[in-house]
Amino acid sequence: FWPFGKKQEAKFMHRYGYYEIRCRFPKNDGWWSAFWLQSPCIGAHPDPRRAGVECDIMENYRMYKHKKLICGNIWGGYGAEACGHGHFNWPFVETPDGWHHYGVHWHPNGYVFYADGQEVGRVSPDPNDARKVLDGEGSNAGFAGAVVTGPVSEVEQFILVSTECAGYRETGRHAPTLEDAILPDFFEVDFVRVFDEIP
């Protein structure tokens, strides 16, 4: 569970549309920055369409050592009833000024994820749409360009922009990579924008 402090009512709830962030990452290894959508009732109903899904638009915890970013969805809650996820990873390429755009188009027929204007993956509720792309190591886990099968949330969700110390949630583990970090270090956000879905 995430120690976000006292839970407060979401200031902005929304369903469907295009969600985008412009951000610049911390320089030190050990940070886990993310831009994501969450349902206030995830896992509370057996049908994830009604309970919502965790939609990870961008996570950078694999950026420093593996030079990759990830995106994708998790549904069914976080305990024994957790049902699955469909995540994608793609190579991280730095820009000249360090600023990046990440987004997702969430619509009734699925999710389309973007990194710096390029599509990096899709989630579709239709198993016939599934298409896996092998990475250079033969893994068939979600890779840029793949389409995975998963539920589509039909409920309003809220936006989270977060940074945490990678690994701190694991029992008995701290984040040693940050012990020698050069501070200050920042996850900078220029904007978060939401564009409505127009029928």
Question: Language-model features: where?
Answer:
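GH16 jelly-roll
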Residues: 1-199
